[in-house]
A protein has these predicted regions:
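A short, basic/flexible loop-to-alpha-helix module at the beginning of a structural domain
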Residues: 1-7
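A glycine-rich dinucleotide-binding beta-alpha-beta segment and adjacent secondary-structure elements
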Residues: 208-215, 231-241, 363-365, 393-394, ...
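N-terminal Rossmann-like FAD-binding beta1-loop-alpha1 element of flavoenzymes
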Residues: 10-35
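A conserved FAD-binding loop/helix module that cradles the flavin
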Residues: 478-496
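FAD cofactor-binding and catalytic pocket of flavoenzymes
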Residues: 86-120, 124-126, 146-150, 298-405, ...
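Glycine-rich loop(s) and the adjacent beta-strand/alpha-helix scaffold that form part
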Residues: 28, 32-58, 62, 238-245, ...
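Residue-level detector of alpha-helix initiation sites
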Residues: 12, 16-17, 189, 276, ...
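Conserved redox-cofactor binding core of oxidoreductases
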Residues: 59-91, 96-112, 116-131, 135-240, ...
Protein backbone atom coordinates (compact mmCIF):
# COMPACT_ATOMS: atom_id res chain seq x y z
CA UNK A 1 0.00 0.00 0.00
CA UNK A 2 1.57 3.25 -1.17
CA UNK A 3 1.29 6.34 1.00
CA UNK A 4 2.21 9.94 0.29
CA UNK A 5 1.89 13.07 2.42
CA UNK A 6 0.93 16.57 1.29
CA UNK A 7 0.67 19.64 3.52
CA UNK A 8 -1.73 22.57 3.11
CA UNK A 9 -3.41 25.27 5.14
CA UNK A 10 -6.80 23.70 4.45
CA UNK A 11 -8.02 20.40 3.04
CA UNK A 12 -11.52 20.57 1.54
CA UNK A 13 -13.42 17.37 0.75
CA UNK A 14 -15.83 17.89 -2.15
CA UNK A 15 -15.85 20.34 -5.06
CA UNK A 16 -19.57 21.02 -5.39
CA UNK A 17 -21.50 24.14 -4.40
CA UNK A 18 -20.06 24.25 -0.87
CA UNK A 19 -16.59 22.88 -1.57
CA UNK A 20 -16.16 25.30 -4.45
CA UNK A 21 -17.09 28.28 -2.31
CA UNK A 22 -14.77 27.11 0.47
CA UNK A 23 -11.91 26.89 -2.04
CA UNK A 24 -12.67 30.34 -3.44
CA UNK A 25 -13.00 32.11 -0.09
CA UNK A 26 -9.99 30.49 1.54
CA UNK A 27 -7.58 30.87 -1.38
CA UNK A 28 -8.60 34.50 -1.87
CA UNK A 29 -7.81 35.00 1.82
CA UNK A 30 -4.27 33.76 1.18
CA UNK A 31 -4.53 30.12 2.26
CA UNK A 32 -3.01 27.18 0.39
CA UNK A 33 -5.93 24.84 -0.23
CA UNK A 34 -6.27 21.27 -1.44
CA UNK A 35 -9.66 20.17 -2.78
CA UNK A 36 -10.28 16.42 -2.91
CA UNK A 37 -12.87 15.40 -5.51
CA UNK A 38 -13.89 11.74 -5.76
CA UNK A 39 -14.89 12.05 -9.41
CA UNK A 40 -13.49 13.35 -12.64
CA UNK A 41 -12.92 16.84 -13.98
CA UNK A 42 -15.04 18.72 -16.47
CA UNK A 43 -14.02 22.11 -17.80
CA UNK A 44 -15.79 25.20 -16.51
CA UNK A 45 -16.42 26.30 -20.10
CA UNK A 46 -18.28 23.09 -20.77
CA UNK A 47 -20.32 23.42 -17.59
CA UNK A 48 -21.42 26.92 -18.53
CA UNK A 49 -22.14 25.92 -22.11
CA UNK A 50 -24.62 23.28 -21.01
CA UNK A 51 -27.06 25.82 -19.54
CA UNK A 52 -27.62 27.37 -22.95
CA UNK A 53 -28.04 23.97 -24.56
CA UNK A 54 -30.55 22.83 -21.97
CA UNK A 55 -33.07 25.39 -23.14
CA UNK A 56 -33.33 23.48 -26.40
CA UNK A 57 -32.77 19.93 -25.24
CA UNK A 58 -35.69 17.54 -24.82
CA UNK A 59 -35.63 14.77 -22.23
CA UNK A 60 -35.31 11.39 -23.99
CA UNK A 61 -33.86 7.96 -23.50
CA UNK A 62 -32.14 6.94 -26.64
CA UNK A 63 -29.12 4.67 -27.15
CA UNK A 64 -27.87 1.27 -26.22
CA UNK A 65 -25.23 3.10 -24.19
CA UNK A 66 -28.01 4.47 -21.99
CA UNK A 67 -29.33 0.96 -21.48
CA UNK A 68 -25.89 -0.30 -20.50
CA UNK A 69 -25.57 2.57 -18.07
CA UNK A 70 -28.79 1.49 -16.41
CA UNK A 71 -27.13 -1.81 -15.57
CA UNK A 72 -24.48 0.11 -13.63
CA UNK A 73 -26.81 2.91 -12.48
CA UNK A 74 -30.15 1.36 -11.48
CA UNK A 75 -30.64 4.01 -8.78
CA UNK A 76 -29.10 7.05 -10.47
CA UNK A 77 -31.12 6.46 -13.63
CA UNK A 78 -34.37 6.97 -11.70
CA UNK A 79 -33.85 10.73 -11.49
CA UNK A 80 -35.22 13.01 -14.20
CA UNK A 81 -31.76 14.54 -14.65
CA UNK A 82 -29.96 11.30 -15.50
CA UNK A 83 -30.60 11.21 -19.29
CA UNK A 84 -29.11 14.69 -19.69
CA UNK A 85 -25.80 13.81 -18.07
CA UNK A 86 -25.47 10.07 -17.21
CA UNK A 87 -21.71 10.08 -16.73
CA UNK A 88 -21.99 12.74 -14.01
CA UNK A 89 -23.69 10.31 -11.65
CA UNK A 90 -22.02 7.58 -9.63
CA UNK A 91 -21.74 3.94 -10.58
CA UNK A 92 -24.19 2.26 -8.20
CA UNK A 93 -22.32 -1.04 -8.34
CA UNK A 94 -19.05 0.56 -7.21
CA UNK A 95 -20.82 2.86 -4.73
CA UNK A 96 -23.48 0.82 -2.93
CA UNK A 97 -25.49 1.75 0.13
CA UNK A 98 -28.06 -0.14 2.16
CA UNK A 99 -31.54 0.52 3.53
CA UNK A 100 -33.94 -1.48 5.70
CA UNK A 101 -36.07 -4.00 3.85
CA UNK A 102 -39.19 -2.44 2.32
CA UNK A 103 -37.97 1.05 3.26
CA UNK A 104 -36.08 2.45 0.27
CA UNK A 105 -34.20 5.71 0.07
CA UNK A 106 -33.10 7.06 -3.31
CA UNK A 107 -29.63 8.54 -2.93
CA UNK A 108 -28.74 10.50 -6.08
CA UNK A 109 -25.02 11.32 -6.26
CA UNK A 110 -22.84 13.16 -8.76
CA UNK A 111 -19.10 12.60 -8.58
CA UNK A 112 -17.31 15.13 -10.74
CA UNK A 113 -15.82 18.58 -10.33
CA UNK A 114 -18.73 20.86 -9.49
CA UNK A 115 -20.79 18.09 -7.89
CA UNK A 116 -24.52 18.09 -8.51
CA UNK A 117 -24.53 21.76 -9.48
CA UNK A 118 -22.66 20.82 -12.65
CA UNK A 119 -25.33 18.33 -13.74
CA UNK A 120 -26.96 19.68 -16.87
CA UNK A 121 -30.50 19.47 -15.50
CA UNK A 122 -29.82 21.04 -12.09
CA UNK A 123 -32.90 23.06 -11.14
CA UNK A 124 -31.03 26.35 -10.63
CA UNK A 125 -33.59 27.73 -8.19
CA UNK A 126 -32.04 29.76 -5.39
CA UNK A 127 -34.17 30.92 -2.45
CA UNK A 128 -33.25 32.33 0.95
CA UNK A 129 -34.57 30.87 4.17
CA UNK A 130 -36.24 33.30 6.58
CA UNK A 131 -36.58 33.68 10.33
CA UNK A 132 -39.90 31.93 9.84
CA UNK A 133 -37.77 28.87 8.96
CA UNK A 134 -34.84 29.49 11.30
CA UNK A 135 -37.15 29.85 14.32
CA UNK A 136 -39.72 27.21 13.36
CA UNK A 137 -38.95 24.97 16.34
CA UNK A 138 -39.91 27.51 18.98
CA UNK A 139 -43.06 28.31 17.04
CA UNK A 140 -44.45 24.79 16.67
CA UNK A 141 -42.38 22.60 19.01
CA UNK A 142 -41.02 20.31 16.31
CA UNK A 143 -37.27 20.27 16.90
CA UNK A 144 -34.87 23.06 17.88
CA UNK A 145 -34.37 26.45 16.30
CA UNK A 146 -31.31 27.25 14.24
CA UNK A 147 -28.58 28.99 16.29
CA UNK A 148 -28.62 31.95 13.91
CA UNK A 149 -31.04 34.36 12.27
CA UNK A 150 -31.55 35.87 8.85
CA UNK A 151 -29.65 38.96 10.02
CA UNK A 152 -26.62 36.76 10.78
CA UNK A 153 -26.68 35.13 7.35
CA UNK A 154 -27.88 38.03 5.17
CA UNK A 155 -24.40 39.48 4.38
CA UNK A 156 -23.24 36.05 3.25
CA UNK A 157 -26.35 35.45 1.18
CA UNK A 158 -25.56 38.76 -0.49
CA UNK A 159 -21.96 37.74 -1.21
CA UNK A 160 -23.14 34.62 -3.01
CA UNK A 161 -26.00 36.35 -4.81
CA UNK A 162 -23.89 39.18 -6.17
CA UNK A 163 -21.17 36.84 -7.38
CA UNK A 164 -23.61 34.45 -9.05
CA UNK A 165 -25.88 37.14 -10.46
CA UNK A 166 -29.24 36.01 -9.09
CA UNK A 167 -32.17 37.04 -11.28
CA UNK A 168 -35.67 37.57 -9.96
CA UNK A 169 -38.05 40.17 -8.56
CA UNK A 170 -38.35 41.85 -5.17
CA UNK A 171 -41.61 40.52 -3.73
CA UNK A 172 -41.40 41.78 -0.14
CA UNK A 173 -42.42 38.51 1.49
CA UNK A 174 -41.47 37.78 5.09
CA UNK A 175 -41.43 34.02 4.49
CA UNK A 176 -39.36 34.27 1.29
CA UNK A 177 -36.84 37.10 1.79
CA UNK A 178 -35.72 38.99 -1.28
CA UNK A 179 -32.26 38.33 -2.63
CA UNK A 180 -29.98 40.95 -4.15
CA UNK A 181 -31.03 40.71 -7.78
CA UNK A 182 -28.93 41.71 -10.76
CA UNK A 183 -31.81 41.47 -13.22
CA UNK A 184 -35.59 41.30 -13.03
CA UNK A 185 -37.63 38.59 -14.73
CA UNK A 186 -40.98 39.47 -16.32
CA UNK A 187 -43.87 37.09 -15.83
CA UNK A 188 -45.15 35.19 -18.82
CA UNK A 189 -48.84 35.62 -19.72
CA UNK A 190 -49.54 32.18 -18.25
CA UNK A 191 -47.81 33.02 -14.97
CA UNK A 192 -49.58 36.38 -14.75
CA UNK A 193 -52.93 34.72 -15.31
CA UNK A 194 -52.21 32.22 -12.54
CA UNK A 195 -51.00 34.97 -10.20
CA UNK A 196 -54.06 37.15 -10.77
CA UNK A 197 -56.49 34.29 -10.22
CA UNK A 198 -54.82 32.79 -7.16
CA UNK A 199 -54.11 36.04 -5.32
CA UNK A 200 -57.60 37.36 -6.01
CA UNK A 201 -59.19 34.23 -4.50
CA UNK A 202 -56.61 33.55 -1.77
CA UNK A 203 -54.73 36.75 -0.80
CA UNK A 204 -52.44 34.79 1.54
CA UNK A 205 -51.12 32.78 -1.41
CA UNK A 206 -48.53 34.45 -3.60
CA UNK A 207 -47.27 33.53 -7.06
CA UNK A 208 -43.77 34.87 -7.78
CA UNK A 209 -41.29 34.44 -10.60
CA UNK A 210 -38.38 32.07 -10.15
CA UNK A 211 -35.11 33.18 -8.58
CA UNK A 212 -32.37 31.72 -10.71
CA UNK A 213 -28.78 31.94 -11.89
CA UNK A 214 -26.23 29.93 -13.82
CA UNK A 215 -24.31 27.18 -12.08
CA UNK A 216 -22.02 28.44 -9.27
CA UNK A 217 -18.70 27.68 -10.99
CA UNK A 218 -16.34 28.94 -8.27
CA UNK A 219 -13.24 26.78 -8.73
CA UNK A 220 -11.84 28.82 -11.66
CA UNK A 221 -11.71 31.86 -9.35
CA UNK A 222 -9.84 29.81 -6.76
CA UNK A 223 -7.44 28.45 -9.37
CA UNK A 224 -6.61 32.00 -10.51
CA UNK A 225 -5.12 32.72 -7.09
CA UNK A 226 -2.40 30.14 -7.66
CA UNK A 227 -3.08 28.74 -4.19
CA UNK A 228 -5.47 25.91 -5.09
CA UNK A 229 -4.52 22.30 -5.73
CA UNK A 230 -7.35 20.19 -7.15
CA UNK A 231 -7.00 16.42 -6.85
CA UNK A 232 -9.61 14.43 -8.80
CA UNK A 233 -10.41 10.71 -8.44
CA UNK A 234 -9.61 11.13 -4.73
CA UNK A 235 -12.05 9.10 -2.60
CA UNK A 236 -11.85 10.31 1.01
CA UNK A 237 -11.81 7.43 3.48
CA UNK A 238 -11.08 8.99 6.88
CA UNK A 239 -10.49 12.27 8.64
CA UNK A 240 -7.15 11.91 10.41
CA UNK A 241 -7.16 12.80 14.10
CA UNK A 242 -4.40 13.32 16.65
CA UNK A 243 -5.54 12.28 20.13
CA UNK A 244 -2.66 14.19 21.75
CA UNK A 245 -3.62 17.56 20.30
CA UNK A 246 -7.35 16.91 19.94
CA UNK A 247 -7.25 18.17 16.36
CA UNK A 248 -7.78 16.86 12.88
CA UNK A 249 -4.51 16.56 10.97
CA UNK A 250 -5.86 15.93 7.49
CA UNK A 251 -7.67 13.42 5.31
CA UNK A 252 -6.79 9.93 4.11
CA UNK A 253 -7.98 9.10 0.62
CA UNK A 254 -7.78 6.45 -2.09
CA UNK A 255 -6.91 7.10 -5.72
CA UNK A 256 -10.04 5.80 -7.44
CA UNK A 257 -8.10 4.69 -10.50
CA UNK A 258 -5.00 3.08 -8.98
CA UNK A 259 -6.22 2.05 -5.54
CA UNK A 260 -3.19 3.67 -3.89
CA UNK A 261 -3.72 5.41 -0.56
CA UNK A 262 -2.58 8.90 0.35
CA UNK A 263 -2.69 11.35 3.21
CA UNK A 264 -3.25 15.08 2.81
CA UNK A 265 -2.46 17.20 5.85
CA UNK A 266 -3.80 20.63 6.69
CA UNK A 267 -4.29 23.08 9.54
CA UNK A 268 -8.03 23.01 8.80
CA UNK A 269 -10.28 20.26 7.43
CA UNK A 270 -13.51 21.29 5.69
CA UNK A 271 -16.07 18.62 4.80
CA UNK A 272 -18.34 19.57 1.90
CA UNK A 273 -18.88 16.20 0.25
CA UNK A 274 -22.67 16.25 0.56
CA UNK A 275 -24.96 15.53 3.49
CA UNK A 276 -24.76 11.75 3.60
CA UNK A 277 -21.21 11.45 2.29
CA UNK A 278 -19.72 13.84 4.86
CA UNK A 279 -21.56 12.05 7.65
CA UNK A 280 -20.41 8.67 6.37
CA UNK A 281 -16.83 9.93 6.42
CA UNK A 282 -17.11 11.13 10.02
CA UNK A 283 -18.75 7.88 11.14
CA UNK A 284 -15.88 5.93 9.58
CA UNK A 285 -13.28 8.15 11.29
CA UNK A 286 -13.43 6.28 14.57
CA UNK A 287 -10.81 6.17 17.29
CA UNK A 288 -10.55 5.39 20.98
CA UNK A 289 -11.44 9.03 21.61
CA UNK A 290 -14.46 8.86 19.28
CA UNK A 291 -15.68 5.25 19.10
CA UNK A 292 -19.02 6.30 17.56
CA UNK A 293 -17.56 8.54 14.90
CA UNK A 294 -15.39 11.63 14.88
CA UNK A 295 -16.91 14.71 16.54
CA UNK A 296 -19.85 12.72 17.90
CA UNK A 297 -19.85 13.21 21.66
CA UNK A 298 -23.42 14.52 21.32
CA UNK A 299 -24.63 11.28 19.73
CA UNK A 300 -26.36 13.37 17.06
CA UNK A 301 -24.09 12.48 14.15
CA UNK A 302 -26.14 10.75 11.49
CA UNK A 303 -29.50 11.67 13.01
CA UNK A 304 -32.25 13.98 11.70
CA UNK A 305 -31.86 13.17 8.02
CA UNK A 306 -34.40 15.15 5.99
CA UNK A 307 -35.38 15.42 2.35
CA UNK A 308 -38.27 17.39 0.93
CA UNK A 309 -41.47 15.49 0.47
CA UNK A 310 -41.86 15.31 -3.27
CA UNK A 311 -44.79 14.62 -5.56
CA UNK A 312 -44.45 14.25 -9.30
CA UNK A 313 -47.29 16.73 -9.26
CA UNK A 314 -50.24 17.72 -11.36
CA UNK A 315 -50.43 18.42 -15.06
CA UNK A 316 -52.92 20.71 -16.74
CA UNK A 317 -53.79 22.33 -20.04
CA UNK A 318 -53.83 26.10 -19.60
CA UNK A 319 -56.25 26.89 -22.46
CA UNK A 320 -54.12 29.85 -23.56
CA UNK A 321 -54.57 31.66 -26.87
CA UNK A 322 -51.85 30.68 -29.34
CA UNK A 323 -50.05 34.03 -29.07
CA UNK A 324 -49.51 33.45 -25.33
CA UNK A 325 -48.06 29.96 -25.63
CA UNK A 326 -44.28 29.77 -25.23
CA UNK A 327 -42.15 26.94 -26.61
CA UNK A 328 -39.47 27.68 -24.03
CA UNK A 329 -40.06 26.43 -20.51
CA UNK A 330 -40.62 28.98 -17.77
CA UNK A 331 -41.27 28.49 -14.11
CA UNK A 332 -42.73 30.30 -11.13
CA UNK A 333 -42.96 29.61 -7.43
CA UNK A 334 -45.73 29.62 -4.83
CA UNK A 335 -44.09 29.99 -1.38
CA UNK A 336 -45.43 28.32 1.75
CA UNK A 337 -48.87 29.55 2.75
CA UNK A 338 -50.03 26.83 5.15
CA UNK A 339 -49.28 27.29 8.88
CA UNK A 340 -47.94 30.80 8.33
CA UNK A 341 -50.37 33.13 10.10
CA UNK A 342 -52.38 30.30 11.65
CA UNK A 343 -52.00 26.59 12.39
CA UNK A 344 -55.45 25.23 11.73
CA UNK A 345 -54.29 22.24 9.70
CA UNK A 346 -53.68 18.65 10.75
CA UNK A 347 -49.99 18.79 9.89
CA UNK A 348 -46.96 20.83 10.94
CA UNK A 349 -44.84 23.09 8.70
CA UNK A 350 -45.73 23.48 5.03
CA UNK A 351 -44.84 23.23 1.37
CA UNK A 352 -44.00 25.38 -1.63
CA UNK A 353 -45.08 24.70 -5.20
CA UNK A 354 -42.86 24.98 -8.25
CA UNK A 355 -44.89 25.80 -11.35
CA UNK A 356 -43.48 24.87 -14.77
CA UNK A 357 -45.11 26.08 -17.98
CA UNK A 358 -44.32 25.33 -21.61
CA UNK A 359 -46.57 25.61 -24.62
CA UNK A 360 -50.09 25.16 -23.34
CA UNK A 361 -49.03 22.77 -20.60
CA UNK A 362 -48.58 23.47 -16.91
CA UNK A 363 -46.98 21.28 -14.24
CA UNK A 364 -47.33 21.91 -10.48
CA UNK A 365 -44.68 20.21 -8.30
CA UNK A 366 -45.06 20.57 -4.50
CA UNK A 367 -42.01 20.28 -2.20
CA UNK A 368 -42.82 19.92 1.50
CA UNK A 369 -40.77 20.26 4.66
CA UNK A 370 -39.94 17.04 6.47
CA UNK A 371 -40.00 17.58 10.23
CA UNK A 372 -36.66 16.53 11.81
CA UNK A 373 -36.65 13.16 13.56
CA UNK A 374 -33.78 11.40 15.29
CA UNK A 375 -35.12 8.11 13.93
CA UNK A 376 -34.33 9.16 10.36
CA UNK A 377 -30.63 8.51 10.33
CA UNK A 378 -27.44 7.45 8.60
CA UNK A 379 -25.17 4.76 10.04
CA UNK A 380 -22.53 2.50 8.51
CA UNK A 381 -23.34 -0.85 6.96
CA UNK A 382 -21.76 -3.76 8.80
CA UNK A 383 -21.73 -5.98 5.71
CA UNK A 384 -21.37 -3.83 2.57
CA UNK A 385 -18.35 -1.84 1.39
CA UNK A 386 -17.70 0.22 -1.70
CA UNK A 387 -15.20 -0.65 -4.40
CA UNK A 388 -12.37 0.87 -2.32
CA UNK A 389 -13.16 -1.01 0.88
CA UNK A 390 -14.91 1.83 2.69
CA UNK A 391 -18.06 0.84 4.63
CA UNK A 392 -21.22 1.84 2.81
CA UNK A 393 -23.81 4.16 4.29
CA UNK A 394 -26.91 2.56 5.78
CA UNK A 395 -29.84 4.94 5.35
CA UNK A 396 -32.89 4.50 7.56
CA UNK A 397 -35.44 7.14 6.58
CA UNK A 398 -39.18 7.01 6.12
CA UNK A 399 -42.06 9.39 5.64
CA UNK A 400 -44.12 10.27 8.70
CA UNK A 401 -47.87 10.68 9.03
CA UNK A 402 -47.19 14.42 8.93
CA UNK A 403 -45.56 14.05 5.50
CA UNK A 404 -48.53 12.10 4.18
CA UNK A 405 -51.10 14.60 5.47
CA UNK A 406 -49.11 17.52 4.08
CA UNK A 407 -48.85 15.88 0.66
CA UNK A 408 -52.59 15.21 0.52
CA UNK A 409 -53.23 18.86 1.25
CA UNK A 410 -50.74 19.89 -1.43
CA UNK A 411 -52.53 17.84 -4.07
CA UNK A 412 -55.87 19.39 -3.11
CA UNK A 413 -54.63 22.98 -3.12
CA UNK A 414 -52.79 22.55 -6.42
CA UNK A 415 -55.96 21.30 -8.06
CA UNK A 416 -58.04 24.17 -6.74
CA UNK A 417 -55.48 26.76 -7.88
CA UNK A 418 -55.29 25.24 -11.35
CA UNK A 419 -59.06 25.28 -11.67
CA UNK A 420 -59.33 28.84 -10.35
CA UNK A 421 -56.95 29.95 -13.12
CA UNK A 422 -59.12 28.27 -15.75
CA UNK A 423 -56.72 25.40 -16.38
CA UNK A 424 -57.99 21.93 -17.25
CA UNK A 425 -56.48 19.35 -14.90
CA UNK A 426 -55.38 16.36 -16.98
CA UNK A 427 -53.24 14.28 -14.64
CA UNK A 428 -52.88 14.01 -10.87
CA UNK A 429 -49.79 12.23 -9.51
CA UNK A 430 -50.66 11.94 -5.83
CA UNK A 431 -48.16 9.26 -4.79
CA UNK A 432 -45.52 10.47 -2.38
CA UNK A 433 -42.11 9.76 -3.87
CA UNK A 434 -39.48 7.71 -2.08
CA UNK A 435 -37.40 9.78 0.36
CA UNK A 436 -34.34 11.11 -1.44
CA UNK A 437 -36.05 11.71 -4.77
CA UNK A 438 -36.24 15.46 -4.16
CA UNK A 439 -32.40 15.43 -4.07
CA UNK A 440 -32.52 18.03 -1.29
CA UNK A 441 -31.21 15.86 1.56
CA UNK A 442 -30.00 17.76 4.64
CA UNK A 443 -29.40 17.19 8.35
CA UNK A 444 -27.29 14.47 10.08
CA UNK A 445 -24.64 16.82 11.58
CA UNK A 446 -26.76 19.71 12.73
CA UNK A 447 -25.48 22.97 14.16
CA UNK A 448 -26.71 24.33 17.45
CA UNK A 449 -26.03 26.48 20.50
CA UNK A 450 -25.64 23.49 22.85
CA UNK A 451 -22.83 20.99 22.28
CA UNK A 452 -24.86 18.30 24.06
CA UNK A 453 -27.54 18.31 21.35
CA UNK A 454 -25.65 19.30 18.21
CA UNK A 455 -22.55 18.33 16.23
CA UNK A 456 -21.51 21.83 15.11
CA UNK A 457 -21.52 25.30 16.60
CA UNK A 458 -23.19 28.26 14.80
CA UNK A 459 -20.14 28.66 12.55
CA UNK A 460 -20.17 25.07 11.23
CA UNK A 461 -17.25 24.24 13.53
CA UNK A 462 -17.12 20.92 15.35
CA UNK A 463 -17.69 21.30 19.07
CA UNK A 464 -15.24 18.43 19.66
CA UNK A 465 -12.52 19.04 17.07
CA UNK A 466 -11.90 22.79 16.71
CA UNK A 467 -10.17 22.73 13.31
CA UNK A 468 -12.87 20.56 11.70
CA UNK A 469 -15.72 22.25 9.80
CA UNK A 470 -18.74 20.78 8.01
CA UNK A 471 -20.39 23.26 5.65
CA UNK A 472 -22.71 21.24 3.41
CA UNK A 473 -26.37 20.41 3.98
CA UNK A 474 -25.61 18.09 6.88
CA UNK A 475 -25.41 21.15 9.16
CA UNK A 476 -29.11 21.99 8.66
CA UNK A 477 -31.32 22.05 11.75
CA UNK A 478 -34.54 22.10 9.74
CA UNK A 479 -35.07 22.56 6.04
CA UNK A 480 -38.00 24.80 5.19
CA UNK A 481 -39.71 24.12 1.84
CA UNK A 482 -37.23 26.18 -0.21
CA UNK A 483 -34.43 24.68 -2.30
CA UNK A 484 -31.43 24.46 0.06
CA UNK A 485 -28.40 25.21 -2.14
CA UNK A 486 -28.30 29.01 -1.68
CA UNK A 487 -28.37 28.61 2.09
CA UNK A 488 -25.62 25.97 1.97
CA UNK A 489 -23.37 28.31 0.00
CA UNK A 490 -24.07 31.27 2.30
CA UNK A 491 -23.29 29.16 5.36
CA UNK A 492 -20.02 28.09 3.74
CA UNK A 493 -19.01 31.70 3.09
CA UNK A 494 -19.85 32.61 6.69
CA UNK A 495 -17.87 29.65 8.03
CA UNK A 496 -14.86 30.53 5.87
CA UNK A 497 -14.88 34.13 7.10
CA UNK A 498 -14.85 32.73 10.63
CA UNK A 499 -12.01 30.29 9.84
CA UNK A 500 -9.83 33.06 8.44
CA UNK A 501 -10.47 35.23 11.48
CA UNK A 502 -9.66 32.39 13.86
CA UNK A 503 -6.43 31.62 12.00
CA UNK A 504 -5.33 35.25 12.11
CA UNK A 505 -6.05 35.42 15.83
CA UNK A 506 -4.03 32.26 16.48
CA UNK A 507 -6.98 30.32 17.84
CA UNK A 508 -6.77 27.77 15.01
Amino acid sequence: MTSSRMNFDAVVVGSGACGGWAAKQLTEAGLRVLVLEAGRSESADKMLWTWHRLRQKVLRYRTETDERRKERQPIQSTTFAWPFHPHAFVDDVDNPYTTPDEQPFTWIRARQVGGRTSVKAHGRQFYRLSDFNFKAGSRDGHGPDWPLSLADLAPHYETVERWMGIRGNADGLDTLPDSVFTESIPMTPAEQRLKDAVERRWPERRVVVRRTASAPVTLPAALKTGRLTLRTHAVASQVLYDEKTGRATGVAYVDAETGKTYEAHGRIVVLAAGTIESTRLLLHSRSSAFPDGLANTSGQLGRNLMDHTYLLGLEARMNLPAEHQRAEQSWAYIPQFRNVSESAHDFARGYGVQVFTFGDQCHFVPFGEMVPSGDNRVTLSTTVKDRWGIPAAHIDCKHSDNDVKMSRDAVATCQEMMKEAGFTVEKVNDTLSTPGMAIHEVGTARMGSDRKTSVLNPYNQSWDVPNLFVTDGSCFVSQGPQNPTLTMMALTVRACDYMVGELKSGRL
